[in-house]
A protein has these predicted regions:
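Non-catalytic, well-ordered alpha-helical scaffold segments
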Residues: 6-10, 40, 69
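Short amphipathic alpha-helical interaction segments
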Residues: 3, 32-49, 62
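Short, amphipathic alpha-helical interaction segments positioned at domain boundaries
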Residues: 63-81
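Small side chains
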Residues: 16, 42-43, 65, 71
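Short amphipathic alpha-helical interface segments
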Residues: 2-32, 80
Length: 81
């Protein structure tokens, strides 16, 4: 069972919320200011919960699309609790 930190999830969701429809954002721990392990755990958790309109994994690198309705709801929930 994945147990990501709330702040790591908020960081990824906030970054993805800035994307336009159809674009993908490569997840880079250095760019996001997260530890690699924390970023991977949070990304897996959020992808499993359908928080992005799409995602892609190629050669161990993950990219995510804009937020789905579920992602917007989760960001709101995490940011306000």
């Amino acid at each position: 069972m994945l147990n990501p930190s709330k702040s790591d999830c908020i960081t990824i969701l906030t970054a993805a919320s800035q994307l336009s429809d159809g674009s993908l954002m490569p997840l880079d721990s250095r760019t996001l200011g997260l530890s690699r392990n924390g970023m991977e755990t949070a990304a897996s958790f959020l992808i499993e919960r359908a928080c992005f309109t799409r995602h892609r994994e190629v050669n161990g690198h993950t990219a995510v699309g804009s937020l789905s309705l579920q992602g917007r709801m989760r960001l709101d929930q995490l940011a306000n609790n």
